[in-house]
C-alpha cells in the first residue's frame, strides 16, 4: 500500500523555509526543541479561534522571536495590544531567562491556506455538519481563491459509522512528486461524539522554480 510522505519534508531548503531558525550544540539542542514544542502548543491552544496557520521561531543568545501567521491578527493583538502582552507574559513562564518578541503576520488568503482549511473542516465536523458538505464547500472556496488544485481527506468514524474509513475529495491537480511544486499541507483533528476524525488537506499553489524547458528556451533565444 503506497504511503504519502509529508509534502514539506523534501521541499524544506528547496522551496520552503524552516519553521525553526536557530542553531544549538548537542548540549542545548534537546532543551530548545522541547521548548519550541511547548511554545507552539501553547500559542495554538491559546489562540485557536484566531486561525493560526504556522509559527516560526527564531533564536539568538537570550532572545526568542515568534512570527505568528494568523487569519485574524486583531484577535491575538487585542485592544491596544493587551492580547499580545498577555500572551507574552504567559509564554515567559514557559521560557525562563529569555526575552520574547512576538511578530504577528496576517494570512492574506485564509481560504487558500491548507492548515486553516483543515481546521475549518474539523470545526464544522464538531458542529455535526455532514463531512461531504464541509469538504466540498472548502474545496469550492479554495478553487475560487485561485489555487491550482486541492485535495482533502477525512478519516475516522464518518457519520457515526461502526467501521472507520477514509474519504477523499479533490479538484484540480496535486503534483506531489514535483519538488518545485508549491504544495501546502495541513492537518487537524475533530473531536466528535463518535471519536476523533482526522482531516488532511493538500493545496497546490503553482510552481515556484522555473521549468527546465523555459530556461532552455531563454538560452536559445539569447544565443
Curated annotation (Swiss-Prot):
<dbReference type="InterPro" id="IPR036419">
    <property type="entry name" value="Ribosomal_S3_C_sf"/>
</dbReference>
<dbReference type="GO" id="GO:0003735">
    <property type="term" value="F:structural constituent of ribosome"/>
</dbReference>
<keyword id="KW-0689">Ribosomal protein</keyword>
<keyword id="KW-0694">RNA-binding</keyword>
<dbReference type="InterPro" id="IPR015946">
    <property type="entry name" value="KH_dom-like_a/b"/>
</dbReference>
<dbReference type="InterPro" id="IPR009019">
    <property type="entry name" value="KH_sf_prok-type"/>
</dbReference>
<dbReference type="GO" id="GO:0006412">
    <property type="term" value="P:translation"/>
</dbReference>
<dbReference type="GO" id="GO:0003729">
    <property type="term" value="F:mRNA binding"/>
</dbReference>
<dbReference type="GO" id="GO:0022627">
    <property type="term" value="C:cytosolic small ribosomal subunit"/>
</dbReference>
<comment type="function">
    <text>Binds the lower part of the 30S subunit head. Binds mRNA in the 70S ribosome, positioning it for translation.</text>
</comment>
<protein>
    <recommendedName>
        <fullName>Small ribosomal subunit protein uS3</fullName>
    </recommendedName>
</protein>
<dbReference type="GO" id="GO:0019843">
    <property type="term" value="F:rRNA binding"/>
</dbReference>
<dbReference type="InterPro" id="IPR004044">
    <property type="entry name" value="KH_dom_type_2"/>
</dbReference>
<keyword id="KW-0687">Ribonucleoprotein</keyword>
<dbReference type="InterPro" id="IPR001351">
    <property type="entry name" value="Ribosomal_uS3_C"/>
</dbReference>
<dbReference type="InterPro" id="IPR004087">
    <property type="entry name" value="KH_dom"/>
</dbReference>
<feature type="domain" description="KH type-2">
    <location>
        <begin position="39"/>
        <end position="108"/>
    </location>
</feature>
<dbReference type="InterPro" id="IPR005704">
    <property type="entry name" value="Ribosomal_uS3_bac-typ"/>
</dbReference>
<dbReference type="InterPro" id="IPR018280">
    <property type="entry name" value="Ribosomal_uS3_CS"/>
</dbReference>
<dbReference type="Pfam" id="PF07650">
    <property type="entry name" value="KH_2"/>
</dbReference>
<comment type="similarity">
    <text>Belongs to the universal ribosomal protein uS3 family.</text>
</comment>
<dbReference type="Pfam" id="PF00189">
    <property type="entry name" value="Ribosomal_S3_C"/>
</dbReference>
<comment type="subunit">
    <text>Part of the 30S ribosomal subunit. Forms a tight complex with proteins S10 and S14.</text>
</comment>
<keyword id="KW-0699">rRNA-binding</keyword>
Amino acid at each position: 500500500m503506497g504511503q504519502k510522505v509529508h509534502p514539506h519534508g523534501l521541499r524544506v531548503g528547496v522551496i520552503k523555509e524552516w519553521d525553526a531558525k536557530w542553531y544549538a550544540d548537542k548540549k542545548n539542542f534537546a532543551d530548545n526543541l522541547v521548548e519550541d514544542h511547548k511554545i507552539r502548543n501553547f500559542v495554538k491552544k491559546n489562540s485557536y479561534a484566531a486561525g493560526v496557520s504556522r509559527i516560526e521561531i527564531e533564536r539568538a543568545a537570550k532572545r526568542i522571536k515568534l512570527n505568528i501567521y494568523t487569519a485574524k491578527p486583531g484577535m491575538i493583538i487585542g485592544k491596544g495590544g493587551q492580547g499580545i502582552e498577555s500572551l507574552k507574559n504567559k509564554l515567559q513562564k514557559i521560557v525562563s531567562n529569555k526575552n520574547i518578541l512576538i511578530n504577528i503576520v496576517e494570512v492574506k488568503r485564509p481560504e487558500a491556506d491548507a492548515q486553516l482549511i483543515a481546521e475549518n473542516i474539523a470545526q464544522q465536523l464538531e458542529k455535526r455538519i455532514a463531512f461531504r458538505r464541509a469538504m466540498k464547500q472548502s474545496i469550492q472556496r479554495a478553487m475560487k481563491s485561485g489555487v491550482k488544485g486541492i485535495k482533502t481527506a477525512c478519516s475516522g468514524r464518518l457519520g457515526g459509522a461502526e467501521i472507520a474509513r477514509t474519504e477523499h475529495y479533490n479538484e484540480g491537480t496535486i503534483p506531489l512528486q514535483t519538488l518545485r511544486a508549491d504544495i501546502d499541507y495541513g492537518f487537524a483533528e475533530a473531536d466528535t461524539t463518535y471519536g476523533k476524525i482526522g482531516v488532511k488537506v493538500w493545496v497546490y499553489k503553482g510552481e515556484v522554480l522555473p521549468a527546465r524547458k523555459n530556461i532552455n528556451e531563454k538560452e536559445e533565444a539569447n544565443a
